[in-house]
Amino acid sequence: NTPGIVGFGRATALAKEKMEARTKKEVELRDYLIKRVLDEVPYTKLNGDKVKRLPNNVNFSFRFIEGESLLIMLDQKGICASSGSACTSGSLDPSHVLLAIGLPHEIAHGSLRLTLSDETTKEEIDYTVEAIKTVVERLRSMSPLYEDFVKKNKQ
């Protein structure tokens, strides 16, 4: 399949030409997203190393939040996300990777995985962060565990 081989070679060359710029943009957007979420959403944890990670991937855990509810409400706002690892997409079980790095089951269950691309814009990140803040606040307002936590910490 000579045409296929030639086409694959050309596609590889094009990808290599754009890889450095694409990676740089994705890292900048990823780091911006991480900073905003950690600064603006209380009781949130970044899962995995802050630097040694894929340039286009973030995974957060939100205490007192059920992952499935989070996904449904974000989906209603037009945000496509996952609650587990890519290996468990479509499953309601928490990510086995998050459990393996020591997250308790209830925190791993409230995880959110977002994937960016070089086509993602800063405005889309801003929209996503605002949506996350709104949804997390709404879900926590319905959580008896969060209510108990707040009461105990006010004393």
Question: PLM features: residue spans?
Answer:
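Active-site PLP attachment segment
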Residues: 1-11
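A short glycine-threonine-serine/GTX helix/turn-capping micro-motif
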Residues: 1-3, 16-21, 59
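Structural signature of PLP-dependent enzymes
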Residues: 12-35, 45-54
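Flexible, glycine/charged-enriched surface loops at secondary-structure junctions
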Residues: 20-26, 42-49, 84, 139-148
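Generic non-transmembrane alpha-helical segments
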Residues: 32-40, 73, 77-79, 129-138
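Anionic-ligand binding region
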Residues: 34-37, 42-73
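Conserved C-terminal alpha-helix-loop-beta "cap" of PLP-dependent enzymes
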Residues: 58-113
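PLP-dependent enzyme catalytic core of the Aspartate aminotransferase-like
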Residues: 89, 93-155
